[in-house]
UniProtKB/Swiss-Prot annotation:
The gene is purQ. The keyword Aminoacyl-tRNA synthetase does not apply. This is Phosphoribosylformylglycinamidine synthase subunit PurQ. Part of the FGAM synthase complex composed of 1 PurL, 1 PurQ and 2 PurS subunits. The keyword ATP-binding applies. It is found in: Cytoplasm.
């Protein structure tokens, strides 16, 4: 599987993502700086977490307007798989590649802890290696992860099976509507989620619950 990891000022989870992708696919991803206007031929593009541009204006608002994001949008329109994790999810929303918005956590506090996730749709390119309804562990670390969508948008997201993951067992850390933790676009090739699956891909680091997400993508690329 060929993959690319986008790099922007303030993103600090790129090394974790690179390590996870390398371990699972056996091939190190290429890194692409924000000023690039073209992307290499890859199976997967990942925008990792962090605090791009210090979260000024709105989380992801400045990053979404960098040249590389036009290239990401062009690849997504052609069906290339795209994952945005945490700040990467915020960037995808700001870029218009996913519906809805992420607001300040309901607690108004930064939350860093483990949560439980339910696989809400196991029939996406990112979740096929999970069982339907499977409960997994995953860490979160964010201040603005409270997912919101207008009623008509929310109805479409729910009705078309675009919710990939929900917070489960009362572990919603941010007040997200309908416990939404991750969604896909209408075409099913763009995923945004607040939790960090890249941090649970090997037993030595506390578990492997995040591994199946990347294995799902690997299976599609094979």
């Amino acid at each position: 599987m060929k993959s690319a990891v986008i790099q922007l000022p303030g993103l600090n989870r790129d090394r974790d993502m690179i390590a996870a992708l390398t371990k699972i696919s056996g091939q190190a991803p290429v890194t692409v700086w924000q000023t690039e206007t073209e992307l290499p031929e890859v199976d997967l593009i990942v925008i990792p977490g962090g605090f791009s541009y210090g979260d000024y204006l709105r989380c992801g608002a400045i990053a979404a307007r960098m040249p590389v994001m036009k290239a990401v949008a062009e690849k997504a329109a052609k069906g290339v798989l795209v994952i945005g994790v945490c700040n990467g999810f915020q960037i995808l929303l700001e870029a218009g590649l996913l519906p809805g918005a992420l607001m300040r956590n309901a607690s108004l506090k930064f939350v860093c802890r483990e949560v439980k996730l339910q696989v809400a749709n196991a029939n996406t390119a990112f979740t096929r290696a999970y069982a339907p309804g499977q409960i997994i562990r995953c860490p979160v670390a964010h201040h603005d992860g409270n997912f919101f969508a207008a009623p008509e948008t929310l109805a479409r997201i729910e009705g078309e099976g675009q919710v990939a993951f929900r917070y489960a067992e009362g572990t919603n850390p941010n007040g997200s509507i309908n416990d939404i933790a991750g969604i896909v676009n209408g075409a099913g090739n763009v995923l945004g989620l607040m939790p960090h699956p890249e941090n649970l891909v090997e037993a030595a680091h506390g578990g492997t619950d995040g591994r199946a997400l990347f294995e799902s993508v690997l299976g599609r690329a094979a």
